[in-house]
Amino acid sequence: MAVAVFRTRLWRPDPNRSARWNRGAYLVRAVGHCGECHTPRSLLGGVDPDRELGGNPKGPEGKRVANITPHRKKGIGDWSESDIASYLLDGGLPDGDLASGAMVEVIEDSTSRLTEYDRRAIANYLKSVPPQDGN
């Protein structure tokens, strides 16, 4: 009989980080559960914590989901915090393109309704995570 062990990943504030960073971490990791789509899955089907937010080649709709880490070539490393906050408000990408796929609904029904402070807190957190070379 095989037994699989899954780690429960509860979000806890980091006392060594700012209130803004902790708010962003909370919104990304707990409330928004961004990693459910933006993190690749392990062989057992759970999100791979070693590649957190590094993009998913086959997301929930079977399509590629973007790397949202600060990787300069494969992620959003060239985006400013303002670029990220603006994208979460209206879906506009820095290059003039628009959000597509499931992110349209996420933006319309969720992130566009956040306060500016919360959108900037998310941006601050995303700029701080380790860059991932995936997707």
Say what each PLM segment does.
Residues 95-98, 114-121, 128-134:
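Ligand-binding pocket scaffold of soluble enzyme catalytic domains
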Residues 38, 89-92, 130:
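Protein kinase-like catalytic domain
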Residues 51-95, 107-119:
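Electron-transfer interface patches adjacent to heme c in soluble/periplasmic c-type cytochromes
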Residues 24, 31-41, 84, 122, ...:
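The canonical Cys-X-X-Cys-His
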Residues 42-53:
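Small/polar (Gly/Ser/Thr/Ala-rich) solvent-exposed segments
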Residues 1-30, 76:
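Electrostatic cytochrome c docking/interface patches
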